[in-house]
Amino acid sequence: MHIRILGSAAGGGFPQWNCNCRNCRGVRDGSVAAQPRTQSSIALSDDGERWILCNASPDIRAQIAAFPALQPARRPRDTAIGAIVLLDSQIDHTTGLLSLREGCPHEVWCTQMVHQDLSEGFPLFPMLSHWNGGLRHRPIALDGEPFAIPACPRLRFTAIPLRSSAPPYSPHRGDPHPGDNIGLFVEDLDSAGTLFYAPGLGEVDEALLEWMRRADCLLVDGTLWRDDEMLVCEVGDKLGRQMGHLAQSGPGGMLEVLAKVPAARKVLIHINNTNPILDTASAERAELDASGIEVAWDGMHIQL
């Protein structure tokens, strides 16, 4: 299984266009040891030729340009993206579909809740129906059964409902429904390598922990270091848990969760611009290093 990190930042990217927190200011003027990142998205493949896009970042055009395998140029217009899987209906995970309209029709796999949000509140499905057949919805069931996607037939996917938050525009924002957010457990039938992918993760219970323990590689929510980070940095008024993101530090935080699982690789993704782990010289980054936890970066490649 090939895993390509196309984008590793949370919504807004890093640096965020209107943000002057320590990290954003520092990456612009060189005073912070950090590298810019685009908004979160990954690509998966079973053969390195056909790819499944997991979430469609607003930065998808730049991400494709940075990864030539997605544009193999075999014909006048071409793409190696054979399918798209949406793990939620967040703006920063779906807006990229607009930039992919020239390649319609696209096979888009998502839950019924996500399809509802993208048909009504943020109506990408009806909007893009005017471009060569638009988006063809392929429903993801929440029955715990593995499913295959024809673009990469040697991969098996299992959708895992997560406790997180629907986007602000969704009628489910304050009324969570199963399927608003999912994680993916992905298995390669040839190598037996396994991935657990959950860029938006608000709570971890014992059932979810069991899925995480089965994975060779964890690619999980790295949004915030501390739950009150947005308030402390004076860039927001919500706690991480109110936004559906489990902070890394503190009792029950992601660091404690990851210490309970044996995965060979533990990687944080969807990292907010305020998070001190973006600074490679920070004490927080040193704590991750000491714990064997990696920080995803744009262009990172993992093979299982």
From Swiss-Prot:
Pathway: Cofactor biosynthesis; pyrroloquinoline quinone biosynthesis
Residue runs in coiled coils: none
Pfam family, one: Lactamase_B_2
SUPFAM superfamilies assigned: Metallo-hydrolase/oxidoreductase (SSF56281)
Keyword Zinc: no
GO BP annotations, alphabetical order: pyrroloquinoline quinone biosynthetic process
Keyword Zinc carried by entry: no
InterPro entries reported for this sequence: Metallo-B-lactamas, PQQ_synth_PqqB, RibonucZ/Hydroxyglut_hydro
Secretion signal, residue range per the UniProt entry: none
Keywords on record: PQQ biosynthesis, Transport
Family recorded in the similarity comment: Belongs to the PqqB family.
Described function: May be involved in the transport of PQQ or its precursor to the periplasm.
NCBIfam families found in the cross-reference section: PQQ_syn_pqqB (TIGR02108)
Name under which the protein is recorded: Coenzyme PQQ synthesis protein B
